[in-house]
Every structure is written in structure tokens, then in C-alpha cells.
Curated annotation (Swiss-Prot):
A lipid is attached at C23 (N-palmitoyl cysteine). This protein is a component of a D-methionine permease, a binding protein-dependent, ATP-driven transport system. Its main location: membrane. This is D-methionine-binding lipoprotein MetQ. CDD domains: PBP2_lipoprotein_IlpA_like. One of its GO terms (biological process) is methionine transport.
């Protein structure tokens, strides 16, 4: 009986080893990749990249959707996904600094301009003294929004603040605006809040309620923006064949046409 037990144990160990090897091979399959994207319009664009990847490169792209900007990098860092496509460089740089992720950009996608939207006013001339203006609360998009508010003359920031100013850097506020920081996904809903006169919203979230910068924005970030979105992976995965194939598929004419259709001309090619 002891001999039989050892034999079965050895066979079990061998099967377990083979299973582990099989899993490792699947994870490194050059013809499969898991990519994190934000649900909504960017997901629609990624679905076109998914089709191009399959048709042109034989790559099976599994899209994993997220509802916020925090989880996609966390999932990537943990190895739950192989890449993500949702963030611009200033945001990635801040995440690397704050969280210590070993992530790297491997390709550009698009610039999706942010814009100021309102259901209360139609021009900045109508913005009343003391109005509440909603902006995203993550450091990079907060800074991006404040820089845009400065560009349209609503506030003035301290010199030399770079791309990451905060409300503490506001040195002039002629209309005594109250800057309200909210989670980015909440910004579209804030337009229905009686207290919010204006909201600065990323195109990704604005598009979820049918808003586009060119058509609906009271003011819009220009096309010279440094906030080009990226395809990001782990540092130890940057040379993987499936990552290279996905970048090639995303940077295609088909995806560019789809992005401009989905965002009504609001997508600027970044490659």
C-alpha cells in the first residue's frame, strides 16, 4: 500500500507540474493578450483594435473593462492584465511616483481633449460671481483642468507650476469661483446638480452622456495638448510579441477612423 501511495503521489505531482507549465505557456502566448480599458467610448475604440489585431496579426485580444482610472494600473501591476490603454503620460508619471509601479509606455494612442460643459450657461460671460466649477480630483487631471481654466481667463496660477498645479496655486480668481473636486466618473452627473454651474470633463466620461468637445464644450483644450494617451505594460513585458502586435493594431487607420467617429472628431492621432 505504501508503494502504491507513493506512485499515485508521484503521478499527481507530475500532473500538477504539467498543469503549471501549461498555465505558464498560456500566460506567454504571443497570440493572446488581456488589455484594460475604460468602459464606454474608449472601449468602443478598443473593440475596433481588437478586430484589427485578430484580422491582421492573428492576435486574440481580451478586453477587460474598468469604471475608474485607479484600477487599470493596479490590475496591470499585479499581472491580472497584460496591458492597458486609458491614460496620458502625466497621469502615468504620477502613478509611478505615488505607487511605485514598474510600468512603461510602449505606444501612443490619441489626445482626447477635455472641455468645460454646462447645463446652466451657454458662454463664460454668463458665469456668475461665486459660481461652483467642478473638476476631476486626481492630481494630473486636476492640474490639466486648472491649466485650462487659466487659459480661458477664469483664474491665474502661480508661475512655474508645471503640469500639476493644485487649487493652492491659484493666485487670481476674479469671479471668486469655488473649485469643487470630484471623482472623474461623477463629473457628468454633476451637470444636473443645481449648485454646479460648470464642469471640466474628460472626453471619455463626457461621451458617456453624449457630449463632445467640439459640439458641446463651452471651451475646449487645444490640439497642442501634451496629454496624449498611451498603451502601457509592465517593464518586464515591454518586448513581448503580443504587446507589439497590439500596439500595431491600435495604431492603424481603422482605429483612427473609429475614434473620430465615436468621439465626433474629438480624437487627435498621437503617433
Amino acid at each position: 500500500m505504501a508503494f502504491k501511495f507513493k506512485t499515485f503521489a508521484a503521478v499527481g505531482a507530475l500532473i500538477g507540474s504539467l498543469a503549471l507549465v501549461g498555465c505558464g505557456q498560456d500566460e506567454k502566448d504571443p497570440n493572446h493578450i488581456k488589455v484594460g480599458v475604460i468602459v464606454g467610448a474608449e472601449q468602443q475604440v478598443a473593440e475596433v483594435a481588437q478586430k484589427v489585431a485578430k484580422d491582421k496579426y492573428g492576435l486574440d485580444v481580451e478586453l477587460v473593462t474598468f469604471n475608474d482610472y485607479v484600477l487599470p494600473n493596479e490590475a496591470l501591476s499585479k499581472g491580472d492584465i497584460d496591458a492597458n490603454a486609458f491614460q496620458h503620460k502625466p497621469y502615468l508619471d504620477q502613478q509611478l511616483k505615488d505607487r511605485g509601479y514598474k510600468l512603461v509606455a510602449v505606444g501612443n494612442t490619441f489626445v482626447y481633449p477635455i472641455a468645460g460643459y454646462s447645463k446652466k450657461i451657454k458662454s463664460l460671460d454668463e458665469l456668475q460671481d461665486g459660481s461652483q466649477v467642478a473638476v476631476p480630483n486626481d492630481p494630473t487631471n486636476l492640474g490639466r483642468s486648472l491649466l485650462l481654466l487659466q487659459k480661458v481667463g477664469l483664474i491665474k496660477l502661480k508661475d512655474g507650476v508645471g503640469l500639476l498645479p493644485t487649487v493652492l496655486d491659484v493666485v487670481e480668481n476674479p469671479k471668486n469661483l469655488k473649485i469643487v473636486e470630484l471623482e472623474a466618473p461623477q463629473l457628468p452627473r454633476s451637470l444636473d446638480d443645481a449648485q454646479i454651474a460648470l464642469a471640466v470633463i474628460n472626453t471619455t466620461y463626457a461621451s458617456q452622456i453624449g457630449l463632445t468637445p467640439a459640439k458641446d464644450g463651452i471651451f475646449v483644450e487645444d490640439k497642442e495638448s501634451p496629454y496624449v494617451n498611451l498603451i502601457v505594460t509592465r517593464e518586464d513585458n515591454k518586448d513581448a510579441e503580443n504587446v507589439k502586435k497590439f500596439v500595431q493594431a491600435y495604431q492603424s487607420d481603422e482605429v483612427y477612423e473609429a475614434a473620430n467617429k465615436v468621439f465626433n472628431g474629438g480624437a487627435v492621432k498621437g503617433w
